[in-house]
């Protein structure tokens, strides 16, 4: 016996058999050990051959194990020393001779099994013979497995049944009802069939964005082949999906991968056109399996593709096709591209309606039609970095999974009741130990309460169980119905019309009636939701994108008509600006503005401290329920020419290329927010060139070539240009003349093509003395909020409010001096009083003014004399 003449798998089995003999304490290494490890093999090569040869592999394995249990065991000093049984040596000789006779260079696993049958005097040979496995039958099974191939390498077994190992039969999956229905895509499927029907280069490649349904087209073709809805040239074909991962996995030695792929190609080409190979992610062929001097997978495919022997359908994305396949012109010319475009929202709704039954059956909940429409429309509007129908299907799937999880969990009402029962039982046990009258009285009351709660809990639990059972029964019926429909389709294909009639007019209608009865039973006051609605879809969108659900589902008219009132609570004295912003947003939301532009783009002009940035924060909070839903860029940081790359990311080859830009990354991660360009006039002119595309098309390409969507952002730019005209404007004077002066300065600084793209240029006027009181109240409310946790309540009377307003008013500096006044005269004394213990948690503090100081509960603060606050330039006008 020359072990080098055995294949790797044969050697592995011989070593495993030897280890088994040692482990069991047997003195002889016999044919029984070899047969046992051959039949224990996970891949089942030997077991499969025995079954093909007319034997029963399970019965033979049982007989082998029984025989091994009867073999004497050796323990003590002689244990571990084993000897080769003479019949096993003869078995190896017989296997080698059988291999040589068949033209093999190596002894394979099946020859080893054949050797066991040829050595009839051995125990294993006897078991196989009794099991009905003869050398003649086994030889015939081996020939059928090998299909004329000889074992020329140490990994020869990898080539057996290569398609079963490395490919998935899509046509069989279609027959078994394991494929989702394919709705639409008729044009692409027809074009694929057309290319497959060509004489040469009959290999289509489906090219499209991720998630548009390329793989679904291949599955649709498999369904059509099964249903006979294809030309004669494609009838009875088998569509096989190649698993490149399985081909590469475990290929340790050089040439092993090529051998596996070659075996697949030989089976496909040897079938004389019966098999069509589908290669998903086709670009992975390029370089797959390539090592030192080895050929990659694509080079092995080229000859068969060019001759038309190999029918192949590829699928890859546009980017990967351009990056990998187009560079290899010899491979690209052998494929005929078929471009798969993204379906429209209407087509997506049709696709979802076709898939609905499968998802209802899987999750065990109902999916309403409004949920399907919401999935398509909301995903199209709000999830911009992915493609239909994939993103819409994901929405529907996740919403159904979320509802199913809620259905399986205990309802909140029942859960809180059960927790209350546990709490009362603990109290009951504690009261039983007390002997006073009060405790006994409380115990009686508690026991009555406990009985009532337990009865109510039992009733609710019964209701909940009934509702769960109803859903479970419906799910089982749907699964059974699905199986019967697959059975009906197969019966019709096979021409078994009696069976088809029984199914179509008997069992299926009966199950449909039962299902309708279950779904018609409406429980009064259901404890849990049983159907996925548009609201559930909106909640999932909210979790994915950060858009508040209530804002999306609230009526647009009601929401937007309240806008001025809401913004006016935070921004004082700028009614014109608030109105201009509200009308622009209303115009955008009403669909009267180009949907491919941002929601709105505004330029706020005015002096410092009048509420430009505050209005931006108020907008973010109102539109997105979150003041932080805003990316703020201080344009004083973008004064140099090279700083433009910080906005959109460094170009390839520069440091920071992988990091992305400050603007593009912020919007890409959170597409729904306010974008604030503060002090826009300080930016370098090249920054405005970048913004032109954003303002006009609502999109921007970053340094890595990704398109970032700005259509759902609100763009605001603030500037102090012309503020001196606004500050010096006398109260009550017409603003049109001042506006012209300000706009003259703006036009002198910004280029016309930039200004022309801004929706509104809004003037903020200086704050009037009469408006300061409201600002004091807003600032005071924020201070009160800081003390909420301490339960300290502040009250501010009119005199104190007027005192603070007078101290903080400055026409040149707006409301910012007021913030400093409140900090100095209100917050600082309060902080010292809290630290000194004069004001404790839960106290009420009344703030008033006496003379030139504020009093706290009638007392002036016990601190060093507070210096008079001189508001800078209160009387001075800016030149």
Swiss-Prot record:
Entries under PROSITE patterns matching the protein: CLP_R, CLPAB_1, CLPAB_2
Molecular-function annotations in GO: ATP binding; ATP hydrolysis activity
Region spans: C-terminal: 767-879
Keyword Ligase: no
Annotated GO biological process: cellular response to heat; protein refolding
Region span, Repeat 1: 6-71
Binding site for ATP 2: 606-613
Region (Linker): 343-546
Clp R domain segment(s): 3-148
Chief place where the protein resides: cytoplasm
Any single Gene Ontology cellular-component annotation: cytoplasm
Keywords: ATP-binding, Chaperone, Coiled coil, Cytoplasm, Nucleotide-binding, Repeat, Stress response
Residues where ATP 1 binds: 208-215
Function (record text): Part of a stress-induced multi-chaperone system, it is involved in the recovery of the cell from heat-induced damage, in cooperation with DnaK, DnaJ and GrpE. Acts before DnaK, in the processing of protein aggregates. Protein binding stimulates the ATPase activity; ATP hydrolysis unfolds the denatured protein aggregates, which probably helps expose new hydrophobic binding sites on the surface of ClpB-bound aggregates, contributing to the solubilization and refolding of denatured protein aggregates by DnaK.
Subunit structure: Homohexamer. The oligomerization is ATP-dependent.
Protein name: Chaperone protein ClpB
The organism of origin for this protein: Bradyrhizobium diazoefficiens (strain JCM 10833 / BCRC 13528 / IAM 13628 / NBRC 14792 / USDA 110)
């Amino acid at each position: 016996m020359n072990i080098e003449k055995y294949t790797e798998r044969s050697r592995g089995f011989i070593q495993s058999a030897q280890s088994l003999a040692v482990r069991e304490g047997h003195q002889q290494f016999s044919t029984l050990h070899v047969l046992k490890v051959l039949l224990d093999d996970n891949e089942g090569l030997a077991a499969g051959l025995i079954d093909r040869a007319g034997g029963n592999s399970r019965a033979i394995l049982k007989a082998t194990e029984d025989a091994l249990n009867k073999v004497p065991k050796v323990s003590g000093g002689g244990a571990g020393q084993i000897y080769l049984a003479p019949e096993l040596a003869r078995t190896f000789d017989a296997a080698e001779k059988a291999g040589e006779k068949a033209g093999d260079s190596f002894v394979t696993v099946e020859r080893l099994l054949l050797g066991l049958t040829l050595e009839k005097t051995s125990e294993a040979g006897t078991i196989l013979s009794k099991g009905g496995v003869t050398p003649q039958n086994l030889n015939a099974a081996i020939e059928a497995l090998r299909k004329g191939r000889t074992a020329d390498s140490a990994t020869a077994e990898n080539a057996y049944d290569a398609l079963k190992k490395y490919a998935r039969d899509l046509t069989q999956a279609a027959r078994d009802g394991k494929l989702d229905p394919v709705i639409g895509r008729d044009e692409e499927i027809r074009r694929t069939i057309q290319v497959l029907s060509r004489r040469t280069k009959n290999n289509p490649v489906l090219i499209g964005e991720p998630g548009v349904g390329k793989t679904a087209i291949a599955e649709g073709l498999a369904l059509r082949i099964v249903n006979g809805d294809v030309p004669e040239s494609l009838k009875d074909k088998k569509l096989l999906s190649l698993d490149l991962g399985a081909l590469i996995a475990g290929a340790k030695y050089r040439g092993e991968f090529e051998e596996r792929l070659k075996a697949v190609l030989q089976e496909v080409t040897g079938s004389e056109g019966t098999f069509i190979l589908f290669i998903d992610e086709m670009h992975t062929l390029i370089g797959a399996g390539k090592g030192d001097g080895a050929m990659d997978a694509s080079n092995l495919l080229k000859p068969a593709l060019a001759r038309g022997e190999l029918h192949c359908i590829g699928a890859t994305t546009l980017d990967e096709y351009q990056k990998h396949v187009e560079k290899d012109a010899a491979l690209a010319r052998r494929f005929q591209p078929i471009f798969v475009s993204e379906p429209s929202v209407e087509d997506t709704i049709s696709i979802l309606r076709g898939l609905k039954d499968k998802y209802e059956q899987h999750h065990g909940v109902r999916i309403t039609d409004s949920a399907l429409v919401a999935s398509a429309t909301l995903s199209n509007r709000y999830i911009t970095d992915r493609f239909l129908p994939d993103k819409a299907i994901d929405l529907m799937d996740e919403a159904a999974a979320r509802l199913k999880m809620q259905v399986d969990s205990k309802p909140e009402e029942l859960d809180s009741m059960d927790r209350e029962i546990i709490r009362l039982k603990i109290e009951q046990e504690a009261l039983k130990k007390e002997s006073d009258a009060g405790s006994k009285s409380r115990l009686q009351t508690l026991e009555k309460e406990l009985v009532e709660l337990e009865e109510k809990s039992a009733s609710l639990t019964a209701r909940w169980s009934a509702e769960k059972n109803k859903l479970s029964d419906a799910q089982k019926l749907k699964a059974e119905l699905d199986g019967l429909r697959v059975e009906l389709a197969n019966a019709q294909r096979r021409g078994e019309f009696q069976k088809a009639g029984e199914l179509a007019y008997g069992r299926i209608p009966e199950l449909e009636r039962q299902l309708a009865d279950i779904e018609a039973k409406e429980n009064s006051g259901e404890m849990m939701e049983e159907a996925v609605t548009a609201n559930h879809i909106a909640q999932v969108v909210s979790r994915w994108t950060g858009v508040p659900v209530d804002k999306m589902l609230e009526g647009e008219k009601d929401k937007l008509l309240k806008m001025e009132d809401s913004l006016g609570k935070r921004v004082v004295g700028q009614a014109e600006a608030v109105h201009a912003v509200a009308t622009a947003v209303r115009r955008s939301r009403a669909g009267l503005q180009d949907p491919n532009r941002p929601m709105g783009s505004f330029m706020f002009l005015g002096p410092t401290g009048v509420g430009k940035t505050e209005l931006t924060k108020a907008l973010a909070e109102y539109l997105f329920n979150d003041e932080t839903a805003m990316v703020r860029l201080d344009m004083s940081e973008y004064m140099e020419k090279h700083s433009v790359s910080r906005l959109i990311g460094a170009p390839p080859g520069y440091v920071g290329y992988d990091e992305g830009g400050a603007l593009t990354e912020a919007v890409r991660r959170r597409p729904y927010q306010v974008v604030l360009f503060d002090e826009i006039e300080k930016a370098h002119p090249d920054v405005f060139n970048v913004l032109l595309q954003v303002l006009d098309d609502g999109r921007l390409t970053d340094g890595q070539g990704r398109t970032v969507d700005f259509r759902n952002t609100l763009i605001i730019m603030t500037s102090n240009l012309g503020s001196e005209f606004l500050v010096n404007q006398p109260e009550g004077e017409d603003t049109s003349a001042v506006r012209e002066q300000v706009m003259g300065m703006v036009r002198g600084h910004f280029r016309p093509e930039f200004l022309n793209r801004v929706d509104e240029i809004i003037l903020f006027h200086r704050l009037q003395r009469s408006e300061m009181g409201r600002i004091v109240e807003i600032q005071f409310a924020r201070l009160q909020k800081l003390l909420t946790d301490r339960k300290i309540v502040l009250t501010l009377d009119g005199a104190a409010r007027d005192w603070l307003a007078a101290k903080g008013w400055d026409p040149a500096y707006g409301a910012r001096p007021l913030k400093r006044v409140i900090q100095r005269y209100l917050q600082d004394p309060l902080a010292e009083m809290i630290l000194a213990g004069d004001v404790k948690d839960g106290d009420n503090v009344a703030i008033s003014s006496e003379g030139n100081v504020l009093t706290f509960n009638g007392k002036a603060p016990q601190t060093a004399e507070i210096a008079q606050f001189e508001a800078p330039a209160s009387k001075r006008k800016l030149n």
